[in-house]
Each structure stands twice: as C-alpha cells, then as structure tokens.
Amino acid sequence: MNILGIETSCDETSAAVLSDGSVRSNIVSSQRCHTDFGGVVPELASREHERLIVSIVDAAITEANIAKNDLDVIAATAGPGLIGAVMVGLCFAEGLAWALGKPFVPVNHVEAHIFSPFISDEPGHREPKGDFVSLTVSGGHTLLSVVRQDLGYEVIGRTIDDAAGEAFDKTGKMLGLGYPAGPVIDRLAREGDSDFHRFPRALTASSQTSKSYRGNFDFSFSGLKTSVRTWLEAHDSEYVQKHQADLAASIQSAIVEVLVEKSVAAALLHKVNAISVAGGVSANSGLRSAMQAACDRHGIELFIPALAYSTDNAAMIATMAQLMIARGKYRIEDNSYGVAPFARFEAARKGAR
C-alpha cells in the first residue's frame, strides 16, 4: 500500500510517501520567514504553505519513484495546529484524493507524534510489547499519555500554561538567542554548568509535598519564564553574556528534569515498562540523555524517534494513517471528503479513546 502523507500544521511544509510500511520519501521545508518576528506568524505560515505545497508533494512522489495513480491512500493533518495552515494541507490533500479517486484519511497531528518513534525505517526498529507512557513535547503541546496497543490512549497530564518548547523559545529570546531558540539553548548547554543557577521545577516532588504531588502529571512552565526574566533584570548585560552558556544549561536542566521525573513516575505508577518521547523537543540532546539514564535506572525501555522524525514531518502522518487502517481505527470503505479542520487538541482526561 502506497500512502501519501501531508503535514502543514505550523511552519513546516512536508510530504512523504510510505510504501508497505517503509518510508520512501520525506520532504520537509522549514519556513525561515518568521525569524524576525520572534515566533510563527499564522498568516505568513499559511501563505508559505500555499506557495510550497505543490512542489513539496511533487518532490515526495518523485523521490519515491512512483506515479500519482500508484497512490492507494492520501492522508493529511486535520489538526491541531494553526487553522489557516492546517487548511492548506487538508484542502490540498482532499482535492488530490478526490481527483484521483483515492480514499482520504484525516490524521490528528498530536497522535501522529505519539507513534512517530515507531516509523519503520529507523535503524534497529522496535515497538513496545504492551502499553506504554508517551511524552509528547513540542512548542505547542506538552502531554503525558498512557497508550494502548489498539491506538487508544488516556491523557494523564498536560501543561496548564506554556508548553515546554515554548519555554525554551521564550527564555532563549530573553537571552537574545533569536528564534527558534530551542536548538541554540541545546547547543550552548553542552558547554555550560547546569548548576550555575537553580530555576524552579514547578509541580514536582521538589516543589511541593509528596502528598500533593502524587499522581499529578500536569506541567507548568510559566513560572520558569518569570524566574528567568527576574534573574536577568537583576544582573547587568555583561555578566549575562559571560554566563550565557551556564544560563542555557540551567534553563535546560529545569525543563528536562520536570519532563523526565513525571514520565518515569507515570510509568511506575501505571506499571508499564516502556516510555516513548516524541515531538520537536524530543530532538533536545539533554532530554534524550537524561531520559535514557532515568529509564536505565528503572529498567524501562525508551523509544525516541530518529531526529528526522522528531520535528513536524509528513512521514509520521502517513505512518499514523497506516496504523489507523491496519488496526481498524479507520475503514477505507467509509471514506468521505469535507473533513473540518480543528485548531485545538481535544482528548478526554479520563477514559480511553
């Protein structure tokens, strides 16, 4: 089965072809037009997707060495994301599917991230043998879920204010690192001292009594931003510049420690022996190494996507579509067009999907 996946939920325009479970192509174009604005401008993102979508899809099909008529299924992100950006890929995909007489599969962007560690062209590809805890962490989302083999899941924790990726970008902006700042903080942190300053770790065992913490898997990063701003205002610019790497390491440590602590605690509480980490922040080297070390200490198996599949990409959309079909979550014979895009992630906090 040949599946074309299309992803346009934020500022990456991507198309990929999956053939019988193997990635044949994965073309990603990251928009650079937002740098001067310090964040993604929704209208600019939509216009860039409109400008690039045809050439990106054509490139993915060409690299896969197939013809459009060889496609069996077309899938695209239906949300969550910037609604105008989502609509570009969704409408294009539905139109192409209709024109070719092929079934269309709408995919939840966050769910695609959850299963991205299992994209089948990874070296040493493997999957959990049972249920697992998923940490999905990006610029827009920070979710902790317990995932079942039938693709159902229960969200047990989410951010109550800012996402972890947003915390990286906004604190980095305060340090004058530009946008996106996450990768720059990661690079600087390797040269800095994470013990230079201890920024707050909200909603963790170290920040409150064990009784109030137990079972609380929500996240909060707004206090970290405030703490960083307060620290910067109390020190002159020369001192800040001198210790930029130390500050980056301290900020990264504060974010990573929370993510790791809650993920491992969730796995132990729910008695699962596997954790997956996905989303753009899963590319962070500090998170990868700290999560691996914590999992090793507790005998938990760790699954993280290859770097190419950590950030937004269409291979994960095509892979999710394949899983939905294979595991009975989507029936091709029930195919319909005119799917409504959605901006926000809607998942029940209690009860399985």
Curated annotation (Swiss-Prot):
GO terms for cellular component: cytoplasm. Pfam families: TsaD. Substrate binds at T136, V137, S138, G139, G140, D169, G182, D186, N284. One of its GO terms (molecular function) is N(6)-L-threonylcarbamoyladenine synthase activity. Its cofactor is Fe(2+). Fe cation binds at H109, H113, D312. It is an enzyme of class 2 (transferase). Its EC number is 2.3.1.234. Required for the formation of a threonylcarbamoyl group on adenosine at position 37 (t(6)A37) in tRNAs that read codons beginning with adenine. Is involved in the transfer of the threonylcarbamoyl moiety of threonylcarbamoyl-AMP (TC-AMP) to the N6 group of A37, together with TsaE and TsaB. TsaD likely plays a direct catalytic role in this reaction. This is tRNA N6-adenosine threonylcarbamoyltransferase. The gene is tsaD.
